[in-house]
């Protein structure tokens, strides 16, 4: 009776991790020899781990990453791929998010820009940041609809609160004036307060004047920039 009553109270207090750990302790004879402080410490450790797992699960679900399982540990390091390991380590640390930097991933189709952006989004979730993946054409359609139903301002506020916003397929097609203005609103609201990742097929400015052939310095180029803030 006392066992079920205690478990019920733990669940009422939303201490699911402690409840599971307590059930395990009751079934493991070795735990009976532990002191009260030792058993309590194990229960608290399990609760913290359980909450971390639940928070990560929630953040990953909200992020809506195109490649939900993408992670930096699985980055393809085969010979022939030019990877700046120090840059990858810096990005993995999350310092660029804390410093409100933004990332631009450029390169031709198929080099892994979207996968890498999703891996960075997943890493951000691991570190407790919120993330959101959106294809730029889909975002523009959402903003167009928001103008019509009166939710444009609320949509901008929601986007401005995301710690890491991933905008895929940036510059895929020419934009009308209204669409350019909407994107500027999104970027301006996030300037200096949140981080944004853009992926684009647009080449870096390495081509010669008048050149019509896109050129990239590497298969997938990474650049970061800081949006100026008003003093």
From Swiss-Prot:
TM regions (residue ranges): none
By its UniProt entry, which InterPro entries does this protein fall under?
A: AAA+_ATPase, DNAC/IstB-like, IstB, IstB_ATP-bd, P-loop_NTPase
Q: Which superkingdom is the protein from?
A: Bacteria
Record bears the keyword Nucleotide-binding: yes
Alphabetized Pfam families for the sequence: IstB_IS21
Name the Gene Ontology molecular function terms of this record: ATP binding; ATP hydrolysis activity
Q: Which GO terms describe its biological process?
A: DNA replication
Can you tell me which family this protein belongs to? Answer: Belongs to the IS21/IS1162 putative ATP-binding protein family.
Question: Know the name of this protein?
Answer: Insertion sequence IS1162 putative ATP-binding protein
Species of origin reads: Pseudomonas fluorescens
